[in-house]
Amino acid sequence: MTRYYCEYCHSYLTHDTLSVRKSHLVGKNHLRITADYYRNKARDIINKHNHKRRHIGKRGRKERENSSQNETLKVTCLSNKEKRHIMHVKKMNQKELAQTSIDTLKLLYDGSPGYSKVFVDANRFDIGDLVKASKLPQRANEKSAHHSFKQTSRSRDETCESNPFPRLNNPKKLEPPKILSQWSNTIPKTSIFYSVDILQTTIKESKKRMHSDGIRKPSSANGYKRRRYGN
């Protein structure tokens, strides 16, 4: 059975499964060895660069460069005193950040499409699995007050009515296109569509249709209708 080999710890894991590999990569021993490796590598590169700047000469320059390339990197671990000092400084920085809440980015990206995937720890892809949650089912987990949704949450069916581009709201409107001015020629001159008294005319016509014997102008001078004979 194939097993996962860690290049930093120089050891094989028990199984090559995702859970075993993940538990190893987040372990304290692996993180410490990885941090020491990159710290020592950066320190050696800096020392090598400073050494070259101090000892630049024409005689034997190529030999010194070839010999320095063939040298193996020496892993030098920090002393306990240096580690305690680094941990103390790190705790002080974390305490300072916890006391002073920096909400500049949160306010800047408030309401953006990817806000919940960046500023909510439970939704992040990198540290989302490390957030402490209760042992209840997934939909019953209660978020802490630090991760509570305030006004930044957006429901699925919510329609955003706020204007995302306030600078583009100019009270001065653009003139209509020139092509629209030709449409006035297509309307007949006898049309009453744009008439001012169209409402009153419509009401009068409706009344005439509703009442068969509506108010009409008499056909004769005496006010009596003439009887028609024949067809």
UniProtKB/Swiss-Prot annotation:
InterPro entries according to UniProt: Matrin/U1-C_Znf_C2H2, Matrin/U1-like-C_Znf_C2H2, U1-CZ_Znf_C2H2, U1_snRNP-C, Znf_C2H2_sf
Location(s) in or outside the cell: Nucleus
Keyword Manganese applies: no
Gene Ontology molecular function, alphabetical: mRNA binding; pre-mRNA 5'-splice site binding; U1 snRNA binding; zinc ion binding
Cysteines paired by S-S bonds: none
Gene Ontology CC annotations of this record: commitment complex; nucleus; spliceosomal complex; U1 snRNP; U2-type prespliceosome
Chief location bin: nucleus
Other information: Present with 2140 molecules/cell in log phase SD medium.
Protein name: U1 small nuclear ribonucleoprotein C
